Swiss-Prot record:
Binding site for Ca(2+) 2: D610, D612, D614, E621
Subcellular location: Cytoplasm, Cytoskeleton, Cilium axoneme; Cytoplasm, Cytoskeleton, Flagellum axoneme; Cytoplasm
Residues engaged in binding Ca(2+) 1: D574, D578, M580, E585
Organismal lineage: Eukaryota, Metazoa, Chordata, Craniata, Vertebrata
The protein's name in its UniProt record: EF-hand domain-containing family member B
Protein role: Microtubule inner protein (MIP) part of the dynein-decorated doublet microtubules (DMTs) in cilia axoneme, which is required for motile cilia beating. Cytosolic sensor for calcium, modulates the interaction of STIM1 and ORAI1 upon store depletion and the activation of store-operated Ca(2+) entry (SOCE) and NFAT translocation from cytosol to nucleus.
GO process annotations (BP): calcium ion transport; flagellated sperm motility; negative regulation of protein binding; regulation of calcineurin-NFAT signaling cascade; regulation of store-operated calcium entry
Record flagged with keyword Signal: no
One CC-aspect GO term: axonemal A tubule inner sheath
Assembly notes: Microtubule inner protein component of sperm flagellar doublet microtubules. Interacts with STIM1 and ORAI1; the interactions take place upon Ca(2+)-store depletion and dissociate through a Ca(2+)-dependent mechanism. Interaction with STIM1 inhibits STIM1 interaction with SARAF.
GO molecular function: calcium ion binding; calcium ion sensor activity
Taxonomic source organism: Homo sapiens (Human)
Length: 833
């Protein structure tokens, strides 16, 4: 089918005038074209008919009004054919589209709205059309990519199925066609880039006759939509695009030939960035009062009462209610604290009113009691003295701290005590009251009744330190949560037990032990260190050793409290007087000391004290194991005590013929040692048990560090480290507050616990080393009771002044000189004797 679309030369004059057809409808043409524009479909054509699409796609974000749409339509597309030919073309296109298969590419859909068919007449290309605007809203706002024109483009469309076209009658009724006769003055666009390949013909530039185009007015719904979109655009702030208007990702850079295909990636609206989200929009939106009460009920502000939204608008009566009786305003507090000053006249009137009270006359405010009204008239109150004159004998200082020694004060205090007991009941602390009973039948030191139970372990004192309810709480049952008890039983460690979290799942008794039981060794670490024999192992004998230690401690305490010397204690134990203590005598002594020992414990005690294993406890063993020999020193007469021989037993005739042994000393001379090196006090040597002899070869680190007695002093060799007391540097005269260095002039913990007599009297080190004159030194010696003649004082002063390079004398120098002179006199007296 060969069809030439265009205007013949004969028809130009008929169409010269511009005609406007209002309400003219071409059912076949408009229906097909509007329907194709709405459904985004394209009609197929025959190979003879060619389409030349020269349309430019408008940007999706730009929406033009009606006038701009018509102008752009004229510039974009031109229709160069008559109305009747268009009608016939529409019929042909419909028939051609119906004959094709129903399948088109998405990119080809809707091309009919933006492209026009251009006929070829014997290889002559007709002049490009002027333009057309479609009245469909979808056609105006849709984005379509232009297709390539020419033979290739036409051939590709032949045989392809066409999209099913459903013309809409509503859009046909609303659309309006305007036929315009183009004027020769209208200038065509110089260059329009539509993205399609255009065929260039030699006769294309020759055909410059103006053609008539068909303009289809857009429907009214498009104008309403554009008005709403303008309103929405006005509400959005400047610089931010609405989120529903998304531009292509290639806009401005590339030409999207397939805009209907989804683009890869996520397109973020332009303008919604982090800075925009973090920027507060002011002024803020105001919540309506109707919704505010619900918000305040659910989220009340800080410090505001939560009010139910049902009574949010109720009248507020409670804040203005007043309960009780309204009190009247009294005098203000500032008036009471700082009253207004009164005048002199008002003060005199006030004093006159107050003078009638007895308290004002006896104890007036701010002055003493005026006794003149009660005295006889004419008495000289200034020179008259009442009472008896007191003779001044002693000052309060002498009464509190008399200038006497302690012995004199104590002796004077005891004088007349018996008289004060009768007159004033002045008893000493703990002194019993003497009721003066008949001494023939009663002795004041006698004790009657049952002895009070007494325990040395302090159980009675421990009981008295607790309140009764505390003791009852200890004896009472303690309630513990079963959940907490189960948790502690399962997860907390217990002393002497291995942690077993799965113990509850094991069906074994609590005392079950897995694995082979190891037999404990007979010896311990201490036995290995001291190299003890098997019969002397101490492992497993802790209870036995503890009992023996307790018995020995009790006997030591009794001996120390009851006897003054070791010899007196030994004679108390030695009932037979043979210088030895046997087991029976030890049993009797323990009974007298309120110690009831069984035979086994007595044997263990006796074996412990009997070092030489002779069956008796001698004086040396008694002093080492049953006494505190360091506190009960040896007297001189104890060294000369002689042991008498034992008398023979007359029952045994063999012992009767034995001669009596020679008399020996109770203490051997080699058993007597000095208590300390250089001391005159003597004590007995320390006995070592056979198992303890090995310990002499072992020395601890602390004993080696502290064993400096008699060694080279530390001043003879350098010492590393900084000393605790910095005696190596002089103390500053004025010390800083932050200086915590001990220069040796400060007291130690011992001086705080046991202060000297000087510290008790408030005399410190600086007072001893302060330089003083001769008169001040003489006065100090006289006040402390040191009586020296003038010659002796001069001698002491001269010796003390020689100890300083500048001849200065202090109290410490005088004290040292007096000690030296006294020591020299003592030595002189001993030499003369």
């Amino acid at each position: 089918m060969n069809m030439e679309i265009g205007h013949p030369h004969e028809g130009k004059d008929d169409l010269g005038d511009k005609r406007v057809i209002m309400g003219t409808k071409f059912p076949m043409e408009l229906g097909i074209r509007v329907g194709l524009g709405k459904e985004d479909s394209r009609c197929g054509e025959s190979p003879v008919v060619s389409n030349k699409c020269e349309g430019r796609m408008a940007p999706p974000e730009t929406k033009f009004p009606l006038s701009k749409g018509l102008e752009m339509g004229l510039e974009r597309q031109n229709i160069s054919r008559t109305v009747m030919q268009r009608g016939s073309l529409g019929v042909d296109s419909v028939s051609a589209s119906q004959g094709t298969k129903p399948s088109l590419l998405p990119g080809r859909m809707g091309l009919e709205n933006e492209s026009l068919l251009a006929g070829y007449t014997h290889e002559r290309i007709i002049q490009p059309p002027l333009g057309r605007v479609c009245g469909s809203s979808q056609a105006a706002g849709s984005r379509r990519a232009p297709l390539a024109s020419g033979p290739e483009g036409v051939e590709e469309l032949v045989g392809k199925p066409a999209f099913v076209m459903e013309p809409r009658q509503e859009m046909e009724k609303e659309s309006t066609c305007v036929l315009m006769k183009p004027n020769t003055e209208i200038k065509l666009p110089v260059e329009v880039d539509i993205g399609l390949t255009q065929a260039e013909g030699p006769d294309e530039t020759k055909n410059t006759e103006p053609q008539m185009g068909l303009v289809i007015e857009p429907p009214q719904c498009q104008f309403a939509q554009q008005h709403e979109q303008r309103k929405e655009a006005g509400n959005i702030e400047s610089g931010v695009e609405p989120p529903d208007r998304i531009r292509p990702i290639y806009s401005g850079k590339f030409f999207d030939r397939t805009p209907c295909w989804p683009s890869a990636g996520k397109v973020i609206p332009v303008g919604y960035r982090v800075a925009t989200c973090l920027t507060e929009k002011l002024p803020r939106l105001i919540t309506p009062p109707e919704a505010k009460k619900y918000f305040n009920f659910r989220y009340p502000p800080a410090g505001v009462e939560r009010v139910f939204y049902g009574r949010a608008n109720d009248p507020q009566i409670a804040p203005y209610l007043t309960h009780g009786i309204r009190s009247k305003i009294s005098v203000l507090a500032n008036t009471l604290i700082n009253p207004q000053p009164i005048t002199t006249f008002q003060q005199k009137i006030k004093d006159k009113k107050e003078s009638i009270y007895l308290s004002n006359r006896r104890a007036p405010l701010g002055k003493s009691h005026d006794q003149a009204p009660g005295l006889p008239k004419g008495m000289d109150t200034t020179n008259t003295t009442f009472g008896t004159a007191v003779i001044k004998e002693y000052s309060a200082k002498d009464v509190v701290n008399p200038p006497k020694s302690y012995e004199e004060v104590f002796k004077e205090g005891n004088e007349g005590h018996d008289l004060y007991v009768v007159s004033h009941n002045d008893y000493y602390a703990g002194e019993a009251k003497n009721r003066k009973y008949n001494p023939s039948s009663f002795h004041r030191c006698s004790v009657y009744g049952v002895p009070t139970p007494h325990f040395n372990d302090g159980r009675a004192m421990a009981k008295s330190l607790y309140w009764l309810h505390e003791l009852q709480m200890k004896r009472g049952a303690k309630f513990v949560s079963k959940r907490a008890d189960d948790f502690k039983e399962k997860f907390q460690h217990k002393l002497g037990r291995v942690l077993d979290p799965i113990a509850e799942t094991m069906n074994v008794p609590p005392d079950c032990t897995f694995g082979a039981c190891l037999r404990p060794e007979e010896y311990g670490v201490g036995d290995l260190i001291h190299n003890r024999l098997p019969d002397e192992y101490l492992r497993g004998k802790d209870r036995q050793r503890a009992l023996i230690a307790a018995v020995r401690h009790h006997l030591k305490k009794v001996n120390y409290q009851k006897f003054d010397t070791l010899l007196a204690a030994f004679r108390h134990y030695d009932k037979k007087g043979d210088g030895m203590i046997d087991k029976d005598e030890l049993q009797e002594a323990c009974d007298q000391a309120n110690l009831s020992l069984d035979d086994k414990l007595l044997d263990q005690l006796f074996d412990y004290c009997d070092v030489d294993n002779d069956g008796f406890i001698n004086y040396l063993e008694f002093a080492n194991f049953l006494n505190w020999k360091d506190k009960m020193l040896l007297k001189e007469y104890e060294e000369r005590v002689i042991i008498k021989g034992r008398k023979p037993d007359c029952v045994n005739p063999t012992e009767a013929n034995v001669e009596e042994p020679e008399q020996t000393l109770l203490i051997k001379p080699e058993d007597i040692v000095l208590k300390e090196a250089g001391s005159t006090e003597k004590t007995l040597r320390t006995l070592l048990r056979p198992s303890d002899k090995v310990s002499n070869y072992y020395k601890t680190t602390s004993s080696e560090i502290n064993a400096i007695v008699g060694a080279i002093p530390s001043t003879c060799y350098p010492i590393c480290g900084v000393p605790t007391i910095r005696s190596d540097i002089p103390a500053p005269r004025i010390r800083r507050i932050s200086d915590r260095t001990n220069y040796g002039e400060e007291g130690s913990a011992y001086s705080l616990l046991y202060p000297t007599i000087f510290a008790r009297k408030g005399v410190f080190e600086r007072d001893f080393f302060k330089t003083r004159s001769k008169e001040e030194i003489a006065e100090i010696l006289c006040n402390i009771g040191v009586k020296l003649s003038d010659e002796e004082f001069e001698n002491v002063w001269n010796l003390a002044s020689k100890k300083h390079h500048r001849g200065e004398v202090c109290v410490e120098n005088i004290r040292n000189v007096l000690d030296e002179l006294r020591h020299a006199d003592r030595i002189k007296c001993k030499t003369l004797m």
